[in-house]
């Protein structure tokens, strides 16, 4: 019996060591997250006014927090370089591929020929639209500082994309394809808001400064 007790004690000590190591690793990762989060804040502060305004305006969209907004602005750059929403959709590689056979055109999987990092971020954001439209406190506060046109676009995106998600899932489409379709339309709203920021020259307005 004493040997069994010793084995039990040794096992507990080993478990405690492993648990302590995991806690230390979690703390270190939390410190890294805080470090990079602060670095992102500093980068936003040093960015041109128009960039700061765009980053803030995009956060009015559901599923687009600070890091996602920064990624979108960094990867897309000037939204005005795309004349139509379909062009930025193609840039992300979220448009269906097409195959011609005689007189018939068939659509296949998405091309994936565009910016893969941007595409991944959009798909992650698109998952948020499975929930019913609502404004979280952060979004309410943010939209209060934005022009009505941008706030209206963000709300319209919630209504449109949630409905899109519901209709496609009702057709028993695979969830992956449904979210990809939602992501494709989401980039259209992102493009529209980015263009609106540029058109209104919001970079000079204090109420939309980051």
Language model: regions and residue ranges:
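A detector of single, family-specific signature residues
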Residues: 1-210
